[in-house]
Amino acid sequence: MEIPPEISHALSEIGFTKYEILTYWTLLVYGPSTAKEISTKSGIPYNRVYDTISSLKLRGFVTEIEGTPKVYAAYSPRIAFFRFKKELEDIMKKLEIELNNVKKEEQRPAIWRSRSFDEAIEMFRESLYSAKNEVIVVTPSEFFETIREDLIKTLERGVTVSLYIDKIPDLSEFKGKGNFFVRQFYKLNHLIGMTDGKEVVTIQNATFDSIGPPSFKSTYPEIIFSQYSLIIEIFKESTLEKEIIGNPKDIRFFAMFHAVDFVKNHLKNRNIYAEITGKNLESGRLETLTGRVVGYTLSLREAVNNIHLETENGVVKVGGMFAVIEDYESTEIKFIMG
């Protein structure tokens, strides 16, 4: 029997054999049938019908009706693929759980590209879910509703969200959810998400092409540096419009210019203590620093931003990603408000 080529191709793409495609299509078109009827209508050799039916039953696409002879019926595509999708999601969850249990070695950098907006948004969400300290989100306001729930879930995990947007939306739903900083910036075409300074997702020219914009996710340091530098330029021209501090004892940043801006706004009125994991630029070793924040440098023109931390070994300067002139470089900054 003739099957539309696009249907045959689509089913083969998800692992259906030629006989499985013919059998499922035959049952959809002609309704419940015996093995002999399936063979006659589909052209499948009779001795291959039963193993094909068994395979489709295991997949959840066909059911068996008891009787003499036995009759077989296809589940509708909506029901069959609902089951199939759930099965795939269960497998995906098991993979993610097992992957999280594996101690990962440091992986080489990579880049993943897409021309699908929906796929790019999934990459964006995946990046948000992996965050531990801070996510920076730059988005045109028309896409805010698409990611609203994802931002709330990120805040609820204790991760700081720093949002840049052209029009300030209703944020009442975000109160008490976590530490949320909203800055207004008007020149927005791209949607950018940067997570902990370790990976970045960029959906380019999203406002002009919301169906198939060129998009990528990358862990290459060079690309992260490029996008980080772009975000600093956006920061320079933005204004802080909303600050929600839901966890004053656990305020996390990876972007030092955000951490310094927070210190600038609060140090006069509050004591700020810090727990920082940073690389000693002299020895190259990772160290944990604790102490009271006693000062800061925020000079965007000279590209210098750091905090001055009073530790048991004296006052040290902690810079952010790609720090050079400071004592330490850090992307793991936690503030505790006194």
Swiss-Prot record:
A Pfam match: Regulator_TrmB
Record flagged with keyword Transcription: yes
Coiled coil: none
Chain residues forming the annotated DNA-binding region: 33-54
Keyword Oxidoreductase: no
InterPro entries reported in the protein's UniProt record: tran_reg_TrmB, TrmB-like, Tscrpt_reg_TrmB_C, Tscrpt_reg_TrmB_N, WH-like_DNA-bd_sf, WH_DNA-bd_sf
Gene Ontology terms, MF aspect: DNA binding
Keyword terms: DNA-binding, Repressor, Transcription, Transcription regulation
Subunit structure: Homodimer.
Entry remark concerning the domains of this protein: Contains an N-terminal DNA-binding domain and a C-terminal sugar-binding domain.
Function: Inhibits transcription of the trehalose/maltose transport gene cluster (malE operon) and of the maltodextrin transport gene cluster (mdxE operon). Acts by binding to two different operator sequences in both promoters, preventing polymerase recruitment and transcription.
Family as reported in the entry's similarity comment: Belongs to the transcriptional regulator TrmB family.
Protein name per the record: HTH-type sugar sensing transcriptional regulator TrmB
